[in-house]
């Protein structure tokens, strides 16, 4: 009976992974269909930039919501079976999609404006303090790798 929580948690993580893989495959298939359409017709369908941006943001939000909800369910389940907190189970890393968004922004500007930080916080569903900390830590980590060793 004591193996049940670990088994259920493992299965929930597998479901989360399958969802992410399926989502990525669907996005790739959509891109392939658009490319094929563009080859056959000669161009992509005309969609205004605002509509395209809105749709992309909504799709991203839905994907993130599902992944976050699965992650929350996993955490909630683990908390139920680990009420004393004896075992450290909290991940200290952001999910991959958040890290990728922050990395892309970092490549553009290592010192983003407050507006950009607020935008990232909204997209990633993090606080601006978490965004600030991530950029500070990232700058500190990359600073050590740029010039090689100094003696």
UniProtKB/Swiss-Prot annotation:
Its main location: nucleus. One of its GO terms (molecular function) is DNA-binding transcription factor activity, RNA polymerase II-specific. It is found in: Nucleus. It comes from the Eukaryota. SUPFAM superfamilies: Homeodomain-like. Residues 87-146 bind DNA. Keywords: DNA-binding, Homeobox, Nucleus. GO terms for cellular component: nucleus. This is Homeobox protein HD-1. It comes from Encephalitozoon cuniculi (strain GB-M1). The gene is HD-1.
């Amino acid at each position: 009976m004591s193996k049940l929580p670990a088994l259920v948690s493992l299965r929930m993580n597998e479901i989360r992974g399958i969802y992410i893989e399926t989502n990525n495959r669907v996005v790739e298939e959509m891109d392939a269909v658009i490319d094929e359409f563009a080859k056959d017709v000669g161009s992509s369908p005309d969609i205004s930039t605002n509509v395209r941006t809105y749709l992309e943001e909504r799709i991203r939000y839905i994907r993130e919501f599902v992944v976050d909800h699965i992650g929350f369910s996993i955490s909630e389940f683990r908390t139920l079976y680990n009420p004393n907190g004896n075992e450290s189970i909290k991940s200290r890393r952001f999910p991959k999609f958040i890290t990728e968004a922050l990395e892309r922004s970092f490549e553009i500007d290592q010192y983003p404006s407050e507006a950009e930080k607020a935008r990232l916080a909204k997209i990633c569903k993090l606080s601006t303090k978490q965004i600030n900390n991530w950029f500070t830590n990232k700058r500190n980590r990359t600073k050590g790798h740029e010039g090689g060793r100094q003696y």
